[in-house]
Amino acid sequence: MYYIGLDVHKKTISYCVKDASGQVHREGTIGANRNELDWWMKTLPQPWTVAMEATIFTGWIYDHLLPHMRPR
């Protein structure tokens, strides 16, 4: 399982991908839009789950990512 932390801003999303041992596999920034999220999700190691702080900018991201996440 891979664990992804998101730091969501109005125009960008910073991310960090770690494995179960805590080793960082990837860090970066993508644009905060559906097209970039779709591209980014295709590049992620499987399976994965995500965590992010709930802010005014995160509602649509949660809704967009939810169908792609593996249930616990």
What are these regions (language model features)?
Residues 1-72:
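Phosphate- and other anionic-substrate recognition elements at nucleic-acid/protein interfaces
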